[in-house]
Amino acid sequence: KKLLFVDDSIVRGTQLRETVEFLYESGAEEVHMRSACPPIMYGCKYLNFSRSNSDMELLARKTVQELEGDEGQAHLDEYADASTERGRCMLRSICEKLGFDSLGYQSLDGLLEAIGIDRDKICTYCWSGAE
């Protein structure tokens, strides 16, 4: 069976690893993952949404650090964009880590369009770092 698993967000990825293992043990041949929001690159400084003590606990940021070290932190916007080489590289790395056959994130523009709220009326800090 080929499965498409959709989640509202991927924060640290710890629960997904166990879920993917369970799906394969239960007979899945492929597990494809889609996130309804963009990669979380920054811990929430307003509501503590991500419950992370450090940005490096966030799966996307941790992956960037593993791929490129401190140099990668200057290119977070590229990593958050699946149409760039850095973005594709991050997706491949997360797939390998968590056992996905494919991974896709909603873009920030796509998210804003889907919810119908103007960019200037919603906080996007955890995705873009913009205050």
Where are these regions (language model features)?
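PRPP-associated nucleotide enzymes
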Residues: 1-131
